[in-house]
Amino acid sequence: MAKGVNQIINNIRLRKLRKILNQINALSEEFSNFSDEALQAKTKEFKVYLNDNKASLNHILPQAYATVREASKRVLGMYPKDVQILGAIAMHQGNIAEMQTGEGKTLTATMPLYLNALTGKGAYLITTNDYLAKRDFLEMKPLYEWLGLSVSLGFVDIPEYEYAENEKYELYHHDIVYTTNGRLGFDYLIDNLADDIRAKFLPKLNFAIIDEVDSIILDAAQTPLVISGAPRVQSNLFHIVKTFVETLEKDKDFIVNFNKKEVWLTDEGSEKASHYFKVNSIYQQQYFDLVRMIHLSLRAKYLFKYNLDYFIFDGEIVLIDRITGRMLPGTKLQSGLHQAIEALENVEISQDMSVMATITFQNLFKQFDEFSGMTGTGKLGEKEFFDLYSKVVIEIPTHSPIERDDRPDRVFANGDKKNDAILKTVIGIHETQQPVLLITRTAEAAEYFSAELFKRDIPNNLLIAQNVAKEAQMIAEAGQLSAVTVATSMAGRGTDIKLSKEVHDIGGLAVIINEHMDNSRVDRQLRGRSGRQGDPGYSQIFVSLDDDLVKRWSNSNLAENKNLQTMDASKLESSALFKKRVKSIVNKAQRVSEETAMKNREMANEFEKSISVQRDKIYAERNHILEASDFDDFNFEQLARDVFTKDVKNLDLSSERALVNYIYENLSFVFDEDVSNINMQNDEEIIQFLIQQFTQQFNNRLEVAADSYLKLRFIQKSILKAIDSEWIEQVDNLQQLKASVNNRQNGQRNVIFEYHKVALETYEYMSEDIKRKMVRNLCLSILAFDKDGDMVIHFP
């Protein structure tokens, strides 16, 4: 019923898009008769029209799309099909376009990118990795340049590349920019740490199309981008605590909730810890760090799996994205968790760094005036797209009917029997020369199947996070005659698998999946590697009762039935009742997994709200300071009065010694005035005296700065230094606070309310501390000039 209603709604949306498509098609013959020069001149015509008439882009959409369509035929030899035009219209309108694998999303995106770039405000194509961004940029660059638009790759594809001055500015200030979500996110954070307007390089974020949008803003929504700062004081407890944790008994000394990714000590475990570390109670305030370390070690040991969440490369822990199967180089878990895993695996423990700046992908893309996206699996996430981003998913029909045969699951009582059946199936397919792609949940399983196939003289390519460098080549070869490719779920997205004619004739690509993934979108994405653009092919998932999905998310005890384990596998597999029960168990487990993941993303979004509001305020204030041409209207005396009024109220400045010490610490390193004539019982008199000292010291610094530009830079840097030092500390505190409340049992308190309450309190304290540091910086900084005559500021 619901499916039928959704289809009706989708058809209504498509009907509206088709009206615009008809307008574009009506222009096709006219535009095909244009000379190259006339077609190229359209770009300038559109820009002039938009500027002179203050018209919306919708007014010129039909002509603009007709222009790109015709230009694409002439420059690239590709003429966008009607279904691609529908997807392009949907994305310009800010929707998510669901387009199946092989339907030409790269070409589809050129139309809304071109249209939105005509405003002069820029447009971005954002994808998941460097390879795809560079590939799409190189393929589409000739089209944009032929039409008179500038286009760039938003990064230099050289490892450890150091950008020259203004190089990033030049990369980003093009009409169209191709980049990745990770690179844009880090650049956004770096740009907002600039202490000079000339060091900023990002333009205002106008319009973006996100490729594989569900992967980026749903699946990766909880992953914060973090810029690290100074190292924290390194704890020497990691190895000691690891040894203690190995003595604990699960369910007796500690409880693990795998689904919520929580772990906590029981009363017995707490007593055992107190005895082990020879303290009265580990919950005394002075042992807070010990308790934190115990929780970190438990999480590392029981919530993170080798070859699923991380692997070891060159003596370092490298994280893996569970959903995509891709490695996350340069990314570290925060708040000591990364170091706990390092201790667990006996590799060198790295420095735990403080957090300077952080943002989630959810909030990064909310910085754009508008964004849309495209994916092959959007409909299954439609509710979440709407709830989090107010985005509608429109299912775009395929150009050719999908010929892929998605076969029913094959079911087994246990993993050993299932694995034997998978190997027999792959060998059987290989004997027909039909190519096969075997996809596994973990790298460990992929390595197992690859090795077993080699033992049986079946050559195969192994694609896991550790050898991602060969990904494009392996995927390109996966559709060739007799090819066998074993891969993790990282094979589910990216480069298309193209079939040779011989392969097309013998049934296309066979996709074998060794178990259902945690969400049905990933299952569908993996199946979609076969059957692109009407190609033949088939997919099949193999299931057992001890699959990770079933063990983690199902409360069924069917797997414990001893009779099942001893029954003949072929008889069991042919049992309609058994298949029905297993299908029900798997479907329910996957549904619970999806609902839990959604709740976790909602929780992460709730946590992010406080820091998001605070970050927006801080960044807006920083930009206001950076863009100021003077500070004539800034009331420095009121700033000083606010600080001194609070300090006189909260600090004991009623003695001459206390007042003089306060001046030394906040206003002047050299002070020899007589304060005996000040009435120490009169707060206003003390405040007035402090304001006089502030004004004198501040003016002294301005005199050293000499000209108006240097005075401006001194004030800007003094204020920014105060903001940044306090904001960095606030961000780091909020990260640790979030980790702290996540370790507590949710049933005992409303952790979200608790987090926001503390976050607001600390923000208010931070705001006062910023003012105090501004006063200190304006009065105590030492200004000097280097041999080139450039001003150097030494802050207190």
From Swiss-Prot:
Q: What is its main location?
A: membrane
- As recorded in UniProt, its EC number(s) are 7.4.2.8
Coiled-coil ranges from the UniProt annotation: none
Provide the topology term for how it sits in the membrane: Peripheral membrane protein
Instruction: Output the GO biological process annotations, alphabetical, semicolon-separated.
Output: intracellular protein transmembrane transport; protein import; protein targeting; protein transport by the Sec complex
* InterPro entries assigned: Helicase_ATP-bd (IPR014001), Helicase_C-like (IPR001650), P-loop_NTPase (IPR027417), SecA (IPR000185), SecA2 (IPR022490), SecA_DEAD (IPR011115), SecA_motor_DEAD (IPR014018), SecA_preprotein_X-link_dom (IPR011130)
Top-level EC class as recorded in UniProt:
translocase
**Which residues are recorded as binding ATP?**
84, 102-106, 496
List the GO terms this entry assigns under cellular component, sorted alphabetically: cell envelope Sec protein transport complex; cytosol; plasma membrane
* Database matches in CDD domains: DEXDc_SecA, SF2_C_secA
Task: Tell me where on the tree of life, at the top rank, the source sits.
Answer: Bacteria
Q: Which reaction does it catalyse?
A: ATP + H2O + cellular proteinSide 1 = ADP + phosphate + cellular proteinSide 2
Q: Which UniProt keywords apply?
A: ATP-binding, Cell membrane, Cytoplasm, Membrane, Nucleotide-binding, Protein transport, Translocase, Translocation, Transport
Record's keyword annotation contains Membrane: yes
Please name the SUPFAM superfamilies in this protein's record: Helical scaffold and wing domains of SecA, P-loop containing nucleoside triphosphate hydrolases, Pre-protein crosslinking domain of SecA
The record's subcellular location field reads: Cell membrane; Cytoplasm
**One Gene Ontology MF term:** ATP binding
Q: What does this protein do?
A: Part of the Sec protein translocase complex. Interacts with the SecYEG preprotein conducting channel. Has a central role in coupling the hydrolysis of ATP to the transfer of proteins into and across the cell membrane, serving as an ATP-driven molecular motor driving the stepwise translocation of polypeptide chains across the membrane.
UniProt family annotation:
Belongs to the SecA family.
Q: How does it assemble?
A: Monomer and homodimer. Part of the essential Sec protein translocation apparatus which comprises SecA, SecYEG and auxiliary proteins SecDF. Other proteins may also be involved.
Question: What is the name of this protein?
Answer: Protein translocase subunit SecA 2
